[in-house]
Amino acid sequence: MQVHRMKLLMGSGGGLLFGIIFGWVIFPKILKFMISKQVTLKPGTDIRDLWSATPFPLHFYIYVFNVTNPDDVARGARPQLQEIGPFVFDEWKDKFDLIDDVVEDTVSYNMRNTFIFNEEASSPLTGEEIITLPHPLMQPIGITVQRERAAMMELISKALTLVFPDATAFYSGKFMDIFFRGLDVDCSSEEFAAKALCTVFYTGEVKQAKQMNQTHFLFSFMGQANHSDAGRFTVCRGVKNNMKLGKVVKFADEPELDAWPGDECNQFVGTDSTVFPPGLKREAGLWAFTPDICRSLGAMYQRKSSYHGMPAVRYNLDLGDVRSDEKLHCFCDDPEDLDTCPPRGTMNLAPCVGGPLIASLPHFYKADPKLVAAVDGLNPNEKDHAVYIDFELMSGTPFQAAKRLQFSLDMEPVEGIEPMQKLPKLILPLFWVEEGVHLNKTYTNMVKYTLFLGLKFNSGLRWTIITMSLVGLMSTAYLFYQQYDSLDITMPPKIIKESNKVADEVESSKSKTIEQNSSITTSLPGANQSHHKDRY
């Protein structure tokens, strides 16, 4: 019986130790190893196929700020804005001209985005709505020349009247024309001023313009970006080092940007936003390089979350204040002069796009309150305007996300151009976009069955082993207690003999004491008087 109790004790203790080590140490390492072998950009893997051509469209929303009092604003009044949208598009992403470098463990490719108008999701909007915005070319050109080439102002002013006859500070046109189909740019004039201005169109410096013939171009905000090359990336495949999966190492065949006056701001940090490495630490954030704004942005951990019953973590993004971080002073016009830094929650895009544009979260959410107060019609709030992503860390899977960004004109009066002489100086919102994704059950089930069922199995197994081990330990303790409680308490013979001897001595002592007391009583005078009285 003693042997069985010891076997039960050893088995239960060993089971408890095994459950703890296997459940919290061994199994997670095995699972991470299996994921690291599956989640790579090596040709022939499922992840490579999904990454190369997204098998489902992302949702792309455009919200436009319609200026309802353009004539008043041209005379210096406060702008009144009306948000119109969303205009909804299906965004398809794919990569082409892929070249692998096995030695460097990288893959180079060109990114392509294709936007298809979704009439049903956009309804009742059709895309033919008339929108009033600051003139898409006159205002940016006038402001840029005033800031950077003031000596050419007279020449450019004349050129604008030739290329855009009868143009005013604000332009009214159809949404689809402004954003995709294009506005006509007439470079047919033989005047020197017009030819000087049109040079930037012929040389391709205006990337949003498409040449239609020898003398005409079409300019639009997004037309040239639709189904066209968005730039060549080189990223890590993650075969040799899984933690480098998707990391951007080159863009446009360059190892860093040259848009900003400091090395820190020109570095690539993170991925191209279409893939993330597994096993990230939540405090490290999610970083991605965005060519449209020439900058890497990081979303930071906010809280725990869930998606379709699966645990996740939520990250959100804040452009912050470049003044408060010395490493970000290179995003100022002059890193040595903080007065040249953009307002809190914004980013100056001029060094990136060549025009007076400001990026921020929609409605200036989390930006300097003065920006919101400068115009009418804004209502910043977290639900509609925050950037967020619900992310599964172990597999590196984004469950759902909303990437939102607003583009505004850094407007100011331009003395040399008559229609712009009385404009107010402020940052005027133009439009904002949202790129959203919500994984459907087809893809969430892939994560669920390959990851979470394994985690649930591990959880069930380890707790079953631990519970059975604890029951075994308690049973062993009870058996040992029962054995101890049933033992007979028997004195050794020597102790019994000595105890009897002591008892005899005590009894003999008592007898002698009684005899002595009796003799003393008998010898006392009058001891028998009571007997005589009883006789009478």
UniProtKB/Swiss-Prot annotation:
Matching InterPro entries: CD36_fam
Subcellular location: Cell membrane
Extracellular face of the membrane: 29-459
Keywords: Cell membrane, Disulfide bond, Glycoprotein, Membrane, Olfaction, Receptor, Sensory transduction, Transmembrane, Transmembrane helix
GO cellular component terms listed in the entry, alphabetical order: cilium; cytoplasm; dendrite; neuronal cell body; plasma membrane
Compositional bias annotation for Polar residues: 514-529
Glycosylation sites: 66, 213, 226, 440
Transmembrane portions of the chain: 8-28, 460-480
Keyword Membrane on entry: yes
Top-level taxon of origin: Eukaryota
Pfam families to which the protein is assigned, alphabetical: CD36 (PF01130)
Keyword presence, Glycoprotein: yes
Disulfide-linked positions: 265-330, 294-352, 332-341
Membrane topology reported for the UniProt record: Multi-pass membrane protein
Family, per entry: Belongs to the CD36 family.
Descriptive protein name: Sensory neuron membrane protein 1
Source organism (scientific name): Drosophila willistoni
Protein's gene: Snmp1
